[in-house]
From Swiss-Prot:
Function: Antitoxin component of a type II toxin-antitoxin (TA) system. Labile antitoxin that binds to cognate MazF toxin and counteracts its endoribonuclease activity.
Family (UniProt): Belongs to the MazE/EndoAI family.
Gene3D superfamilies: Met repressor-like
Keyword Signal annotated: no
Keyword Manganese: no
Gene name linked to the record: mazE
InterPro entries in alphabetical order: Arc_rbn_hlx_hlx, MazE
Protein name: Antitoxin MazE
Assembly description: Forms a complex with cognate toxin MazF which inhibits the endoribonuclease activity of MazF.
Domain of life of the native organism: Bacteria
Alphabetical GO biological process terms: regulation of DNA-templated transcription
Keywords from the named record: Toxin-antitoxin system
Length: 56
């Protein structure tokens, strides 16, 4: 009985680890999709501001 419980606990622990790893991967991919758009816009605005200040 003890060995069954240990195996069960190990399986649950392994499932949790895999689940957390999948959630982390999903969060990373969502963040990667969301933030480059903002960064590109920021870069565009920044280069526009720099070119305006050079022209003045």
């Amino acid at each position: 009985m003890l060995s069954f419980n240990q195996n069960r606990n190990h399986s649950l622990e392994q499932s949790l680890k895999e689940g957390y790893a999948q959630m982390a991967d999903l969060n990373l991919s969502l963040a990667t999709e969301a933030f480059p758009i903002e960064c590109e816009a920021c870069d565009c605005n920044e280069s526009h501001l720099i070119s305006n200040s050079k022209n003045e």
